[in-house]
Amino acid sequence: MDEDQSSEQPGSSIPEGSEFLFDPAEFGEEAVEEATRGESAFRSIAKSRAETTPEPPHQICKIRLANILGFVDSTVYPDRFTVMVGANNSGKSSLMRAVGFAQTLLRVHVEREEDTKVVLARGRNLGDPLLPVPEVRDLWHQGIRRKGNEWVMAEIEIEFEDGLQIGFGMKGPFGHATSRLLDDSYREIPREIFDRLTSYPIVYVPSSVGVVDREEYRTPARILSLIAGGRAHEVLRNLLLDLEEEGRLNEVADVIAEYFSGTIDQVSFEPSIDEYIHVSYKEDSDHDLFSAGAGFLQVLQLVTFLVHERPGILMVDEPDAHLHSSLQRLVVDVLRRASQDLGIQVLLATHSKEIINYVDPSELLVIDRHEKELRGLGQHEGAISVLESLGSIDSVDAYEIINQRRLLLVGIGGSQDPSGASRQARQSSVRGRRSSGGDRDWW
């Protein structure tokens, strides 16, 4: 059950005067108690950041995509910690790329910055390197940029929890893309809100495995290009070198040490004599980073992105790939802890039944690019309590039920017998999973 739905007030047992860098009501009593047992490395990082950027990061509450990256017209409602699931080509990665693209468009549209506000340009031409696709036509649903005499508008609109909205529409005349604001009301953004957006950026971490055996020094522009191209594992040492030069490598090392017996020990590069960046980790003795295990490297990459990029919204694409089940659970633990202690939003895409079964059903959100509205299970009123009553229904069952859309969970009118409700709901769920027809009922 979602702890926010507890009958007790979240945070009610917190000692007076305690300081929190995330809202206790957002995560519930259990999460708060866990966070107070000892200060985590993430929490230490959050305290340090609060000295320079006291305002908390933004959280996305609504994403609308129309005629873009395979989406016809869908509105997605993510939570603070959301595990996105769905079939191949359902749109999980496309959704993440679209959100990242919206951030790019916001920066491109900045016309001028004033003391109290930032003014956006109504329209901009977009160069190919700015697009999240190899070819311009790939941005549009089925590559259709024109119908008859009308150019088709590809649209992205995002709403944040504080009411801020931004929206962009793209057209593709003459083989290139142009962008315009969807509404003139989006032209002016209060300065303090814009600064929060840029201080805590949206960061997309593509799926990757391991590291390359040798890594050359890269320029910042080349690093961004490789990450955008899904080759983040090729620049991990470069990011660690940046942190070493900034005096922040210890932040990564401290987090890693909480989860593994070894941690990052040394990062070095001398331009006059070195061709490659050297990174070692210490576990009894020093070892080259290339010899580390897959789980260590995956967690190291995620933590490095969290420290280096300072995201307010972290989007992670299949971080479980090729990992043992226990390491998949560890990745979820690290991301959930980061969300809680750093106060950031995490969107995680996965195919892993291990992860689906490990997380709370309320954290699941099934992505289907052909559906009009996409909400997490926790946003469907009453669904969690009914699922709880089923006992043996786990998150994998919940995912299959949602994905098939064959289950109608309803209150048992006039019944005060929980076991009766559970029995009827269980029978409905069995019929739901086995049925191949019937109405497509939603919660």
For the regions a language model picked out, list residue spans one by one.
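Switch/communication elements of ASCE P-loop NTPase nucleotide-binding domains
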Residues: M1-V110, V255-I256, Q266-E400
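Short, solvent-exposed loop/turn segments at secondary-structure junctions
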Residues: G70, S90, S208-V212, G414-S415
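Glycine-centered tight beta-turn/hairpin loop motif at sheet-sheet or coil-to-beta transitions
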Residues: F71, E159-G163, S261, K282-D284
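Conserved P-loop NTP-binding catalytic core
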Residues: A98-Q165, S268
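Coupling/switch segment of ABC-type P-loop NTPase heads
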Residues: V119-R122, G127, G167-S261, S268-F269
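Short glycine-/polar-rich loops that comprise or flank the Walker A/P-loop
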Residues: T198-I202, P311, D360-S362, Q404, ...
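A short beta-strand-to-loop transition that corresponds to the Sensor-1 phosphate-sensing loop
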Residues: S208, T350-K353, I412
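Conserved helicase/translocase motor-coupling segment
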Residues: Q404-W443
